[in-house]
């Protein structure tokens, strides 16, 4: 019985961990953004699973009001493309409430991940992982690609 359990666990683990992240059955995951026990925004990520790639479209909206008056706004929209479990491209836009706006673009090129953001063009390790809430793999990384500003953290 012990051996059957180990074999079943091995088969299940190889299926579950063959992707860098699990794709939800309904191809969507959403989070509420909570501050001081109040819902101030949302993050919605939609997964498009193609034959050889996964495209993740994420929208983050935050609106903070004080006495019904807007005090802070934030908006971010990104489209990430993953092929064979590897992060290969990003196209994003971030709008901070203080008029800062960033266009984030990145692609795998010549064994590097070439990206642009608030600091201009960056030549990063091809295996860089984006900073995203749904991807637990980022917790194992020493450096991640910040998709809000297009910088390395």
Task: State where each predicted segment sits.
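Charge-rich, low-complexity amphipathic helices
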Residues: 1, 18, 78, 102-104, ...
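Sec-dependent N-terminal signal peptides
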Residues: 3-12
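N-terminal cleavable signal peptides for secretion/export
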Residues: 15-73, 90-100
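Solvent-exposed helix/loop surface patches that form functional interfaces
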Residues: 24-26, 91-153
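Hydrophobic/aromatic beta-strand elements that line small-molecule binding cavities or substrate pockets
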Residues: 43-48, 76-81, 104-106
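Juxtamembrane/interface motifs at transmembrane-helix termini
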Residues: 61-62, 76-77, 108-112
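A short glycine-rich beta-turn/N-cap micro-motif
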Residues: 86-87
């Amino acid at each position: 019985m012990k051996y059957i359990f180990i074999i079943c666990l091995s088969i299940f683990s190889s299926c579950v961990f063959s992707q860098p992240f699990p794709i939800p059955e309904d191809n969507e995951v959403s989070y509420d953004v909570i501050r001081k026990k109040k819902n101030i925004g949302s993050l919605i990520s939609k997964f498009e699973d193609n034959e050889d790639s996964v495209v993740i479209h994420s929208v983050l909206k935050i609106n903070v009001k004080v006495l019904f008056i807007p005090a802070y706004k934030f908006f971010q929209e990104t489209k990430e493309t993953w092929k064979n479990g590897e992060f290969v491209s990003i196209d994003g836009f971030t709008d901070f409430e203080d008029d800062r706006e960033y266009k984030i673009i990145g692609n795998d090129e010549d064994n590097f991940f070439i990206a642009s953001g608030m600091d201009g063009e960056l030549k990063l390790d091809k295996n860089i992982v984006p900073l995203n809430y749904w991807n637990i793999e980022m917790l194992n990384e020493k450096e991640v690609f910040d998709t809000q500003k297009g910088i390395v953290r």
